[in-house]
Amino acid sequence: MNIQSPESSIALELNPTTGLPSLLTKVVAGVEQKQELECTLEIEINGDERRAPTGGIEYFNTSLLRDCRANGEISSYSTAHQEVFEVPVKVGEVKLSLLYQLNTHGPALSIASQFSQQNGVLVRNLVFNVKVKNVDSQSILNVPGNGLRSNLPIETLKDSVGVSPLGGLRGSSATIHLSDSKSSFVAWIDNDVEIPETEVSYADKNLNIKLVSNFASDLSCVRLLEVALMSFDFHLGTWEDFPRIFDTWLRTRGIASPANPPSWVKPAMIFEAQLGFSVFAKVNHYSPYPEVKDLIDDLDRIKNLGFTCIQLMPRQPYPSYNVHDYWDIDTSYGPEVEIRRLVQEAHKRGIRVILDVLLHGILDKEIIKTAADGVRSGPFSNLIEAKTEDSFSADVKDWHNYLIAWSRHIIDFEPYWTDGSPSRTVLEDQHPDWFYRFSSGEIAGVYTKAFDARNSEWQEYFTSAMMNLVEKLDIDGFRFDAPTYNDFHNWAPWARYRAGASALACTGLFEKMRPLFKKRKSDFLFYTEPSGLSLRRSMDLNYNYDEQWLVTALASPQTRKPWGISSAKDLASWIHDRDSVLPRGSMTAHHIDSHDTFWWPSWGSKWRREQFGVEYVRLLTLMFGLLPGPFMMFIGGEEGIEDLLPAIASIKQNEIWTDGSSHWWLSTYTPDDIFGLTHHLEDRAITLLINVSERVMRFDSEIPLESANPLLLNGSYALNNGVLELSPRSAIVLSHDWM
């Protein structure tokens, strides 16, 4: 079974039994190149539903169908930019079509599944496995934005490692690029409706890609439904060539950043402030600002530290990162009059104020009890007292440490959430379609009753509530916390035709909201937590969840994975490659200490300074503080770095840093223990160099620095005849001519 089109550079051979791909062929410079594949398709159906121990929905008594069989004649049709070949198949009792799209723009081949109406079938998941065969052991793997270092020798990948999807929390470009001296192969996990789970491994000369789509549907509700699986291309040149190619792929798919952030954002220093008190291990309280007045009284110090923006968290411990009532400012943040005064006093000092806002759900006593009871009877109940460190490992599919800390958090906050909540939210009866539900009709959630951002009426409610906050408080932006937190299925009658589409519904909501708020206030900031490309479509700024594992991997060698970063130079290369495949104009907020990194570790090891020591934290602060984009810090993280923060703020305001181009120190001249980044504009440049080792480092400079003047010294340096010498655990920032 062969598929080809005169307008496509690629031809596809299908397994005649399964209808799945077995061979890709492409003519390059007159020579026919081939890539053998082995694919399987699995469908999980029917069964029963229950709450998972850590919230959401899990299934049991399901049937897993594995026998995919071709089931009819191939048909085809053309669109403006592709020829589509439809191959009918059956997987067990489920009928569907495989769509092979030969594209004239973007990746050469895209594969999707298409379902039509079938009674009595509940699809719970769809799994697509791809084996890229006969991969040379000397091949190089790049999976930018994930937990693998750049240019990874494929034979190093002994484990199965997660790949974050386009809509993931630790999001990425979702590309898997494999290359050797003769060829390259690219797989792109390009579903941006669901949030799939993907993992890669290498064994027996095969690269294995497993895609768990998280697609779910009651097929009795379906007319015709298409689910993207994966796109392929090969012989595209080296990894260094790929970002330019991928940029055209993104634009073909309409994945783009607005690329017009407020002018104040790029050099911003963001101060994350907490009102009230948070609770850890039941007896430990953290209360930097008990009341609004305490934060107002600290504004001058905050300004002198170099901060230009305050990110105000919801009040702790209630409602914390949950919804009480969007319209009740007093309960959600603090007395409205005082919050308004905080904004006014901040504005007088040239400090912007943005609010942390929640989408995932509303608290009431019913759901709090359900969540807490689930923790007490769940798999982490005996681990709540266990010591936890950083919640993110290099492997994006490893949530073990986080789930222990999350379970402890639920028990710690349970009495405060219970005291502040109504017995049952009135919204449940007033607006039943606003919530995720089991097929039984029961509301689903993690530790709130989960809102479904796909519901158009709820979108109007949320938009109105957010506009009310702007009008009443004169704030300067929002940070949308955890908008994809409800990454499970909604089986409500109106949503069950595509039950997994709710998890990313916030992206459409944000695209509708952006012009309304920009019209109200042109320099208003849209900022969200997930790092994935799907979440960058309507955002000026994204959080750096994808970067957080780098801090621990660099500072704590015992945590490193064979396939992760192992040096400062690796970290620089990782950032460079991650940024190279972001949509143009994307911006990331960097940090080392946030409320997230503070909340999840055990008491006594919450701050990076407690984990790694102040000396190392000073290096990390300069490293992440002077990356392109804003720097943010949680209140209390300034201890031991008070002198560095104003200097970082001053450098970030320099037009060379804000408007210049980047040069990363990645050549063979630069030792592994050196982090180097230069920004240059016309004939001037600023260079940051950091020696993370405990020994003096001497090396040839990648660029001429004879004209250099120090802007910041954390340690000492010398420069003689183009040879740099940096003292142990040191950092320097130099101003100099550009070559």
PLM regions with names:
Residues 1-88:
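Acidic-aromatic substrate-binding/catalytic surfaces of carbohydrate-active enzymes
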Residues 4, 90, 170-258:
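Beta-strand-rich recognition/accessory modules
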Residues 35-45, 50-53, 74-86, 90, ...:
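Polysaccharide-binding surfaces and accessory modules of carbohydrate-active proteins
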Residues 257-264, 274-290, 301, 305, ...:
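Substrate-binding/active-site clefts of carbohydrate-active enzymes
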Residues 276, 484-487, 586-648:
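Aromatic/acidic polysaccharide-binding cleft in carbohydrate-active enzymes
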Residues 363, 369-373, 525-564:
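Substrate-binding cleft/loops of secretory-pathway carbohydrate-active enzymes
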Residues 527, 576, 634-686, 692:
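Glycan-recognition and catalytic regions of carbohydrate-active enzymes
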Residues 720-739:
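C-terminal beta-strand-rich structural cap/linker in extracellular carbohydrate-active enzymes
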